[in-house]
Amino acid sequence: MASLPVQFTRNQISSPFFSVNLRREPRSLVTVHCSAGENRENGEGVKKSLFPLKELGSIACAALCACTLTIASPVIAANQRLPPLSTEPDRCEKAFVGNTIGQANGVYDKPLDLRFCDYTNDQTNLKGKTLSAALMVGAKFDGADMTEVVMSKAYAVEASFKGVNFTNAVIDRVNFGKSNLKGAVFRNTVLSGSTFEEANLEDVVFEDTIIGYIDLQKICRNESINEEGRLVLGCR
């Protein structure tokens, strides 16, 4: 088996047959430059014997380019994930109408931008609404009645849902990362594909919750769930 010596530096990866220069551009982009190294050996026989290694160098270079793009992609995606905050004066009130297009599939003609809106203790306007693909970052729903709501593909990172009643709701593929759900009630609630990474699930009520096995395993990793909640969920 032939081996291909490769040297690594901070901005360059090289071997006798190829080199890759990595240069970071503005906006977290990475530029990759590949070049073939010169064969300094003399003799046709030696050149022929090294030819497969040159091909390996080209393949390795292409693989490194693909790897670099893969590494860079999450950074680009993170920077471009959310659109600019809506400047519409009534954007928070649009939650009272909901997003009626696409519904459970989270398809919408225009983002439902509820970021940083305050719906604290709202007992009437949110009940039964469809909030598909809603942007809820930093929003406050503390004490609100959100029974029978449909939240499909909503992005609720760092939002507050303390004491919210989610009875009979469909919480499908919602990102609750770092959100505060202390004392929230998930009774007869569908929790399919939703994530709660670093969320506060203290004193959350899970009663007759419909949840898949894989999703259950992920929720059970959250250490803020009390013993009663873990028992109801069936966490091991």
UniProtKB/Swiss-Prot annotation:
Gene3D superfamilies per UniProt: E3 ubiquitin-protein ligase SopA
Assembly and oligomerization: Interacts in vitro with LTO1.
The protein's name in its UniProt record: Thylakoid lumenal 17.4 kDa protein, chloroplastic
Residues in Pentapeptide repeat domain copies: 124-163, 169-208
Domain of life from the UniProt record: Eukaryota
PANTHER family: THYLAKOID LUMENAL 17.4 KDA PROTEIN, CHLOROPLASTIC (PTHR47485:SF1)
Pfam family membership, one: Pentapeptide
GO CC, alphabetical: chloroplast thylakoid lumen
Keywords: Chloroplast, Plastid, Repeat, Thylakoid, Transit peptide
Keyword Signal listed: no
Species of origin: Arabidopsis thaliana
Subcellular location: Plastid, Chloroplast thylakoid lumen
The UniProt record lists the keyword DNA-binding: no
